[in-house]
Amino acid sequence: MKLLYFFVVITVLVAVAAALPAKTEEQIAAEENQLVEDLVQYAGTRLTRKRATRCSKKLGEKCNYHCECCGATVACSTVYVGGKETNFCSDKTSNNGALNTVGQGLNVVSNGLSAFQCWG
């Protein structure tokens, strides 16, 4: 009985695979060229984006990097509002006082490490 089910499943999979349209070499080459163009465009915009070199944002302001936020314990935090990512400068990591203190200590370490990201 299991062999019969196995045979039916294989038959259906083969039928579905045979029904799918095959791509021609021209279509594959066109998709490859489009991907290469997209990659070149992305790399170009990525390399020309200016990065922050020192703090310029206060608590609550939007940010992209930790080094943009002024303050030893202030970091660029990410929150999701309505499924959309939002970054802002924040020094609060938890509603629990002890965990918040630990989080601020981690923010200090994170700010130190992000200094390398902000050079240039």
From Swiss-Prot:
It is found in: Secreted. Expressed by the venom gland. Residues 20-51 form a propeptide. One of its GO terms (molecular function) is toxin activity. Contains 4 disulfide bonds. Transmembrane segments: none annotated. Residues 1-19 form the signal peptide. Keywords: Cleavage on pair of basic residues, Disulfide bond, Ion channel impairing toxin, Knottin, Secreted, Signal, Toxin. Its main location: secreted. Weak insecticidal toxin with probable ion channel impairing activity. In vivo, induces paralysis when injected into sheep blowflies (L.cuprina). Shows weak toxicity, since it is only toxic at high doses, and flies recover within 24 hours. The presence of a 'disulfide through disulfide knot' structurally defines this protein as a knottin. This is U3-hexatoxin-Hi1a. It comes from Hadronyche infensa.
